Structure formats: structure tokens, C-alpha cells
Amino acid sequence: MKFISWNVNGLRAVLSKGFEDIFKQLDADFFCLQETKCQPDQVDLSFDGYYQFFNSAERKGYSSTAIFSRKKPLSVSYDFDDMTDHPKEGRIITLEFEKFYLVTAYVPNSKDQLLRIDYRLQWEQAMVRHLNSLKQKKAVIYCGDLKVAHNEIDLKNPDINHFNAGFSDQEREAFTNLLSNGYIDTYRFLYPDKVEYSWWSYRSRAREKNIGWRIDYFVVSEDLKDKIIEAKIHNQIYGSDHCPVELDIDL
């Protein structure tokens, strides 16, 4: 099975940049989108043979996620079970299938000067609880814009970013904690020394210079380790400040 995850930085915007052709070209069984920045009724989009699921923020034009799936899920849920401490920002979709759960997420940004780091860490803890509750029942595939470059190999300029959002010690430790709960970073599992990025700032011609970060992931529960076939970063595909990432897995 082929899975794609892509932060499109605005679905309506990327539709004018060839999104439908890219979607068909990648030909995935599951296509997960983050930062769609829209309500379902704001886009006229439908692909033959796919079920569509949208989770939109209460604040229009902000955050939000979507999944297109060739398989009909057994169940669909949105956000965490307990949203008492979380604003409705449309960040999570969970689909249940016969053999696995698929979770896509648009992780909260810790902001400049780490102004939102406390909430970010609270959110990370809630996500680990969510994934672990699913993992008790069946295998888990977790993907999305996870907003962290885990190790120095995962960004171009680690030395100047240790106190910046996405590479702070706290965020990196939170990702380490996630993996320690029985999960695998599929790309790094297959390619421990490969340097590729999935996000580039719009500033200073960063993409042209390949001054990037790897912050988009497919993470799977350890029981799927032997089923991983390939993990790719499609850095030749434009349309957003992120590029699509791919997981091929035998399910």
C-alpha cells in the first residue's frame, strides 16, 4: 500500500499549482493533507475512487487536515477524545481499517521564542496517549507535519537553531519519547545517513539553496517494522513550502 502525506499550505492555493495532476501522478492509496486552511464547502474537489474526510478549524482559513482514502474505513474520528484543553484547530484525523489505524496530524507550532512551547508539549503528550490507545488494538501509521527536526542530520543549519521552534531540546525530546513508546521513524529506519528535507522557508531562496528541514514523517508502530518497503521524500514536487513524503508498506 502507498501512503502520501503533504502539508499543502492552503488547499485552495495549491489547487492552482497543479495539485490535481500531482495527486493523480503519485497514485496513492491514502493521501493525507495538512494545513488545508479551508472548510469542505470552500473547495470543489473530488477524485474518483476515493473517500474524503476533512477536519476544519473553527477559525476559518487556519490549520485543518484532510484524508483521501481508496479504502472505506471502519470508523472515523476527529481530534483527541478529550478536547477540554485543546482549541478546535482541525489538527487530527484518525481512520480505522481492518488491520491498522491511520492518523494524520498538523502539529502545533511552538512559535517564535518558543511562546507556545508549553501547549506544544501538552499536545505531544496527548498524542502519545492517543496513539498508544490505538496501538493496544492494532497497528498504527502516524503521519503529517510533525513540526520537529529530530536530529542534526534533519536540518541544514542545526548550530543556529537549537533555541528555535522545531529544533528545541524540548521538542526533540518529545519526539524521542514518542519513538520510545514503540514507534519507528520509517525514513530514518531505512536511511540512517541520508540527507533530504521536506520543508524550506520561503525566505532567502531557501529551497533553491536547499536550506531545509525534515519535519514531515511517517511513523509506524514497531509491529510493522518488517513490512516497511520504501520511504521517500518527493523534493522535486513544488506547490507548497513543504513537499510530499511517501511510505510504501506491505499490509
Regions found by a protein language model. Give the residues of each.
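Active-site-proximal beta-strand elements of phosphoester/diester hydrolases
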Residues: 1-9, 99-111, 143
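Active-site beta-strand termini and strand-to-loop segments that position acidic
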Residues: 70, 95-98, 221-222, 247-251
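Surface-exposed cleft-lining segments at the edges of enzyme active sites
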Residues: 81-83, 108-124, 160-163
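Structured beta-strand-rich core segments of catalytic domains in phosphoester-bond hydrolases
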Residues: 37, 42-110
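Active-site beta-strand/loop signature of hydrolases that rely on acidic residues for catalysis
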Residues: 7, 23-41, 102, 130-152, ...
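Metal-dependent phosphoesterases centered on the DNase I-like endonuclease/exonuclease/phosphatase
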Residues: 51, 126-211, 215
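N-terminal, active-site-proximal structural segment of metallo-dependent hydrolase catalytic domains
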Residues: 1-47, 57, 62-63, 78, ...
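Conserved beta strand-loop-helix elements of the APE1-like EEP
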Residues: 60-76, 205-226
